Amino acid sequence: MNNHTSFTSSWIESFILKGKIEDNFSFITKTFTVILCSLILVLSAKIKVDLYPVPMTLQPLAILMISMLCGRNIAVATVSLYLFQGMIGLPVFAYGGGLPYLMGPTGGFLFGFLVASLIIGELADRGWGKVLFKSVFAMMLGMLIIYLFGIVQLSMIKGFEFAILKGMQPFIIGDFYKLILASILLPQIWKLTKISK
């Protein structure tokens, strides 16, 4: 039996392969996709509302969409590249870059992006992006992971109460709307490309 029956292609693979029975697409295509998605993450970091110490950005929405559309491997590679760029000092984060930034108050959210992309991307590879309630659950789980990592690191620096008041409460409503927007967009993208089963 073909192993392809256990897993389904991500949207990006299905879109590029046009329904062909293949396990992977080319290394060059994957690399280009990862670079493009990392640029989207950079841009989403720069669209922000200045709050202290955690800015409100479009990055959670970008993480949700990239992970659900591209699957685990590309999503994890994208976030890894993004974090590496920031770690070596490139100004890709909301307020710059550098290793101290990752170790600072907002670093936990950035590390949460990596774990969230792994979990959401894995579920997307299993076809969850094609089913509304499954995609919503996957993205809610991803959001919770981002909050968990962010709150833990922020509380270690500023205290738990501060972390909840400044690192969680101001973002709940906005992230809820981002989740709703992603949930609306995903099925439409599958339908528009005519690859939804």
What role is predicted for each listed range?
Residues A45-Y52, C70, G89, A94, ...:
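Short helix-capping/hinge motifs at transmembrane helix termini and TM-loop junctions
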Residues N3-E22, T29, L43, L99-L148:
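Short helix-perturbing small/polar motifs within transmembrane alpha-helices
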Residues P55-P60, G97-P105, F162-F171:
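Non-cytosolic membrane-interface motifs at loop->transmembrane helix junctions
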Residues T33-S44, I63, S67, T78-G86, ...:
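Alpha-helical transmembrane segments in multi-pass membrane proteins
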Residues A45-P55, L83-A116:
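Interfacial aromatic-anchored transmembrane helix boundaries in multi-pass membrane proteins
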Residues G129-K197:
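Membrane-embedded alpha-helical hairpins and interfacial helices in multi-pass inner-membrane proteins
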